[in-house]
UniProtKB/Swiss-Prot annotation:
Protein family (similarity comment): Belongs to the disease resistance NB-LRR family.
SUPFAM superfamilies: L domain-like, P-loop containing nucleoside triphosphate hydrolases, RNI-like
LRR repeat extents: 525-548, 550-571, 573-594, 595-619, 638-662, 672-697, 752-777, 787-811, 813-832, 833-857, 859-882, 884-906, 907-931, 946-970
CDD domains: RX-CC_like (cd14798)
UniProt-listed InterPro entries: Apaf_helical, Leu-rich_rpt, LRR_dom_sf, LRR_R13L1-DRL21, NB-ARC, P-loop_NTPase, RX-like_CC, Rx_N
Highest taxon of source: Eukaryota
Sequence ranges assigned to domain NB-ARC in this UniProt record: 135-438
Effect listed in the UniProt record for changing residue 22 to A: In susceptible haplotype
Organism annotation: Solanum bulbocastanum
Name this protein carries in UniProt: Disease resistance protein RGA2
Amino acid sequence: MAEAFIQVLLDNLTSFLKGELVLLFGFQDEFQRLSSMFSTIQAVLEDAQEKQLNNKPLENWLQKLNAATYEVDDILDEYKTKATRFSQSEYGRYHPKVIPFRHKVGKRMDQVMKKLKAIAEERKNFHLHEKIVERQAVRRETGSVLTEPQVYGRDKEKDEIVKILINNVSDAQHLSVLPILGMGGLGKTTLAQMVFNDQRVTEHFHSKIWICVSEDFDEKRLIKAIVESIEGRPLLGEMDLAPLQKKLQELLNGKRYLLVLDDVWNEDQQKWANLRAVLKVGASGASVLTTTRLEKVGSIMGTLQPYELSNLSQEDCWLLFMQRAFGHQEEINPNLVAIGKEIVKKSGGVPLAAKTLGGILCFKREERAWEHVRDSPIWNLPQDESSILPALRLSYHQLPLDLKQCFAYCAVFPKDAKMEKEKLISLWMAHGFLLSKGNMELEDVGDEVWKELYLRSFFQEIEVKDGKTYFKMHDLIHDLATSLFSANTSSSNIREINKHSYTHMMSIGFAEVVFFYTLPPLEKFISLRVLNLGDSTFNKLPSSIGDLVHLRYLNLYGSGMRSLPKQLCKLQNLQTLDLQYCTKLCCLPKETSKLGSLRNLLLDGSQSLTCMPPRIGSLTCLKTLGQFVVGRKKGYQLGELGNLNLYGSIKISHLERVKNDKDAKEANLSAKGNLHSLSMSWNNFGPHIYESEEVKVLEALKPHSNLTSLKIYGFRGIHLPEWMNHSVLKNIVSILISNFRNCSCLPPFGDLPCLESLELHWGSADVEYVEEVDIDVHSGFPTRIRFPSLRKLDIWDFGSLKGLLKKEGEEQFPVLEEMIIHECPFLTLSSNLRALTSLRICYNKVATSFPEEMFKNLANLKYLTISRCNNLKELPTSLASLNALKSLKIQLCCALESLPEEGLEGLSSLTELFVEHCNMLKCLPEGLQHLTTLTSLKIRGCPQLIKRCEKGIGEDWHKISHIPNVNIYI
């Protein structure tokens, strides 16, 4: 890594020497000599990096060079910071503190120059060859959509495992566990994913859960993760182990589930026995699939013969390599093919090796570069279990300089951790790994670097959620990154401190990352770039925080702090301040606007924030502002957003404080093309402007057409803005509008071509249809298809709503999968919802029955929930038409007297029936005994059914005796 950071330092020195600040204190010659000395040393670094692998003295020399490099970087950084501060003062170079500062810098420069001369002299002992430094490989253009490559050579294995799982008939007490066993890099996780997503598996199991276990086999953590996976949401608050166990058993009880435990290392039999005891409540055929490298793990956990994964054939390895190295290139150099096949032989049939080697060579088309990989001495180094580590080391050594340290830095994240791309880029920036190129923003440079590492197969399992990109590293790739850091440790120059839930020290390439419970004296860490105190119990920052002149990244996520010290505003180099979910924080320091380098002010979830610091608009570097609380006074108003080029998402609150549309226009939202998510809210409990003014204000807050997510809360205007009827929302994917009681009609949302999720909560009692326009008379987009992309529709509390469309046509809601109806007593379903798979009807306090034809055209409905319909006495017989229905839940329907005899007989796919708190339900229908697919029946809080369903003697027992899992609760 030394050569990578030296290149960064040289670029910084070159840029600095061209500027005016270097002239301020008269150190131009000294900095020039430093630059020349580093250039001389840099010429031999590539050779040194390759030879250090089996040369301890050379490794020590590189460590000394590393330490000196970071020391020079500190001097340069401090010089620029102080020089900027002095130049902006009224005294300029005649500031009284200039002379002592010059003396201090001069002394440090002399000391580091002596060190570098000794290091330069020592390099002669190693007979290193000079090489021309390759600055950067040619970058290829990439799109924003990232897809996993095709899987080669594993179809046979997938089919065999699927058959084992589907044909498993063991009962719950003998829970089947199938381990997939194989060395690292063979593709165990990929194979498990193929099985998990196979259509046959999806149809066979009632529930599928995927858990990445890694090295921490903690029962409580795993049970919590399984519960969260099943429920699809995080558990709020802490729960003890016993209630967690009970909750999991309730969720799994009577279900034929598939649980995948990926990457298991636990060799403690008792730990597995404890977890297995909780899992033994499922239906016959419930299974656990594990992946592991360790035979002992397979023997401890497995009840079935471990499935040993073999190496890929040379042919499949070649196909995988070729797909990565050549892509869809039509003409391929036959000489490269010949060399490539020799390289693939060295990969030993390990997919990860073939994939990464192909990934690095896809940027190289010179035969010499391919021969260099084939003939590298790294192949001859001692190996552990396979040829994978030499292949991965080669992949690293082939990276351009600017990618090497960015990759190795990822070692600071725990193994198997889900990483956030945007956060990682901010951390790269904080450590100075990214340099601006032309007019490109640093964030865009970081995005390019990230994409290149992804294309070279260093990153995997890409997931995009809420506008953010998450990813993982294969554990062997993570091991490589960690080994690179460990080889370049410098304990004298700590640049990053993390607070985590465990206490130990991890060596990394440019410093050490320190993990601790109590905050140490910050003055000990003068070189600190990153301070990570996320989720800590600290409720106060010391005033010495202002002395960390190099600090770029401060993470206080989830801390209990109520305020921040004013000394924080002395941090001129601070780029990221993460205050997300600091729920007690009520204000920021008044001089926050002095943080001139601040790029990310993250405030999501800090709901106690009552105001913004004044003049936040002067932070012209600001790219991310999670929240903006509107104020009434100048310096606190919406106009502060006007000149900011914001990225990502922003939540604007207290819009009732905006006086008029003129003030709203000053926010200049229509020019912010890099915003993808916008939330706007009014507080209806304080002083309020007139409703007519609110319409004008919202009209003036028209966003840019690049927006993909829009949320509006508490709007009291009489109609929504005109820009909702327009192509302004042509890229919108999700809309949520809540508490807008005065709007008597809705915009034509059916026009929006990309809209996938529409949530309308607490609307006007005057609204009768979600869309009232005629199909052929609408603005914006010339299409007859209404809601062409909508997948989720969630409607709450529209007291007069009759239907979705006033005029129905054949082409409407073609892909609508999920629908939630709350407190809409008169709403009838459209006649054409062929794609609908999930329907929830809740809080209908009026209807005593549903329309007879209500469920007639829902041919693909799989999940139906009817809840809190207090006066509902019967269900329509059209229930029988739901041939695809797998789960039926009827909850808190206090007046329901019976289930339809004919309505249940047609449910030929039903596997789960749950009836809860239906006090008036007198008996179960005869048709239940004909439902041969039904495996789980749960009845709770139905007093009249308890005796009738008593095992063996109850009047209704014969109707349900064939069901494997029957649970009846008081």
